[in-house]
Design a protein with these regions (language model features):
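N-terminal glycine-rich FAD/FM-binding segment characteristic of electron-transfer flavoproteins
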Residues: 1-174
């Protein structure tokens, strides 16, 4: 396990991705490339959907986000993304980066023996600098709320003339 402590500056998605891509590259230089690098689909704080995509780009790997299922065989990851009425399936060559959605797995809780063993596990602290980045919020404002009214123009075929009149008034029909 590698721990990258967050101490010095705000870690925006650009800085976070740079640090993680650097850590992955450093470990891969020793142990060889990982078949899959998995990320959550989005962060809980900013919800930017950026970190996994940025890491994939930095590592030069294909990326698929929004994944609800994964199968790996013969150097290819089949990643399933849920859509209305079914799934989209993406076959990507390994190594790859995937952004997974909540519910992709059922958590396995450690046994007491596993918990005790984890206390002895080595944790490598990577004192990586935040580096370049610095996405800056320029401004944040709430848009003016608009109130819209729903007008029922009738029901069934009797409503057709009223709808045509409204569309002509709006300039949709001429």
């Amino acid at each position: 396990m590698i721990l990258v402590p967050i101490t010095e500056v705000d870690w925006d998605p650009q800085r976070t991705a740079a640090a993680l891509a650097g850590a992955v590259a450093d470990v891969e230089a020793v142990v060889g490339p990982f078949d899959l690098v998995l990320f959550g689909n989005e962060s809980a704080d900013a919800g930017g959907f950026q970190v996994g995509v940025r890491v994939a780009y930095a590592l030069g790997r294909p990326v698929v986000n929004g994944i609800k299922g994964i199968d790996v065989a013969d150097g290819v990851a089949s990643a399933r993304r849920q859509i209305d009425g079914g799934f989209e399936v993406y076959n990507v060559p390994l190594p790859a980066v995937l952004g997974v959605k909540e519910g992709i797995n059922l958590p396995r809780y450690p046994t007491m023996k596993g918990r005790l063993a984890s206390k002895k596990a080595e944790v490598v602290v990577d004192e990586r600098s935040a580096g370049a980045g610095g996405q800056e919020r320029v401004r944040l404002h709430r848009p003016v709320e608009t109130v819209s009214e729903t007008v029922i123009l009738g029901t069934g075929p009797e409503a057709a003339p009223a709808i045509v009149d409204l569309l002509e008034e709006l300039g949709v029909l001429s």
